[in-house]
Regions:
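Boundary at the C-terminal end of the N-terminal hydrophobic targeting segment
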Residues: 5-9
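Beta-propeller-forming repeat regions
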Residues: 12-16, 34-39, 57-66, 70-322
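Structural beta-strand segments of beta-rich domains
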Residues: 17, 26-30
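A structural signal for short hydrophobic beta-strand segments in well-ordered beta-sheet cores
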Residues: 19-21
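Solvent-exposed loop/turn segments flanking beta-strands in beta-repeat/beta-sandwich domains
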Residues: 35-49
Length: 322
């Protein structure tokens, strides 16, 4: 079977209003989503209950021309609860407790991976790329975060890297799962491009990315040969610390759990290593993975209805799309 058998005609995300409140110098600023399903003439009212008291409507006229509102009379010294009511009967709430810092952003706690050491070099982790998607079908976005080690490398650079991790978080910081891409996926900005999209149309987004032997899914299961190590350990080799041999996989993970749903051979392959030269970049070439290990990815509706992962290898000279 094909990994693309997961793809089904796309019916759109079924998201909640996504009501959010951010403190500003002028008051508490609220915004929310409008959806494609909203009927013409839909109106909203915003209410606030302060200190456990009765709800008070904040807007004088129905809100129907925008999807935001500024509460200029909020008292931050007491607990506040706002309720957004639509004329359809839909109700959404937002709560802010007294004493909370008035930061103009929403802070989401995350779980940093432990520091590590490889080939005598210590490394730590920093938060890197992230994406969002409704992983569990509750109508709320979750955050998918890539953790990058401090010894990440550009493709031409020799040397080892720590593993790359993908985490999934609820907006309150609850971690749903962690995927360890393992030792056979080199860490670097040019390597891991992960896609977050509801490919199979079940209302929950999946994660799709390049993996290797020893990748650990969100349930702790290993992909491919768990004992394989395809890194070059010969210090005299021009590919020292790189991965220029061994299988590469394209894997789809379940959004709810991070479980591997399916893995297939990654296309396009890296071979021939010296087949990626051309006029792009510095017009040079190499056979050490400098050009063959540069990736991008995206989602395309190739037939106008069904989402498909699109994987790209090679930035300069030769580029292959699959």
């Amino acid at each position: 079977g094909s990994i693309f058998a997961f793809s089904q005609p796309y019916s759109g995300e079924k998201l909640s209003r996504g009501l959010i409140g951010i403190p500003t110098e002028d008051g508490m600023y609220f915004s929310w989503r409008m959806t494609l399903e909203d009927a013409a003439g839909l109106q909203f009212d915003l209410y606030r209950s302060s200190g456990g008291g009765a709800e008070v409507k904040l807007n004088k006229e129905p809100i129907d021309r925008t999807s935001d509102f500024l509460d200029r009379t909020v008292d931050y010294t007491v607990d506040n609860r706002w309720t957004l009511k639509a004329t359809t009967g839909e109700v959404t709430t937002w709560t802010r407790l007294k004493g909370e810092e008035r930061n103009p952003y929403l802070s989401v706690p995350v779980c940093k991976p432990e520091d590590g050491e490889i080939a005598g070099e210590s490394f730590t982790y920093t938060a890197n790329d992230c994406s969002v998607g409704d992983l569990d079908g509750d109508g709320e976005y979750e955050i998918i975060l890539k953790w990058s080690p401090s010894n990440s490398k550009r493709p031409p650079q020799r040397g080892f890297t720590g593993n790359t991790y993908l985490d999934a978080y609820k907006m309150d910081g609850t971690r749903l799962w962690r995927i360890d891409l393992g030792p056979n996926v080199r860490s670097g900005a040019a390597t891991t491009n992960f896609l977050v999209f509801d490919f199979d149309g079940d209302g929950c987004a999946e994660i799709c990315c390049k993996t290797g032997d020893g990748t650990v899914d969100g349930l702790g299961h290993r992909i491919g040969d768990a004992q394989a190590d395809w890194r070059t350990w010969d210090k005299k080799s021009p590919t020292y610390g790189k991965i220029v041999n061994g299988p590469e996989y394209l894997t789809v993970f379940e959004g709810r759990t991070g479980k591997e749903l399916d893995s297939k051979e990654y296309i396009p392959t890296r071979y021939p290593l010296d087949g990626w030269g051309g006029v792009g970049g510095n017009c040079g070439n190499d056979n050490t993975g400098g050009r063959s290990d540069r990736f991008t990815a995206g989602v395309a509706f190739l037939d106008g209805k069904t989402p498909s992962p699109v994987m790209v290898r090679g930035w300069y000279g030769r580029t292959v799309v699959a």
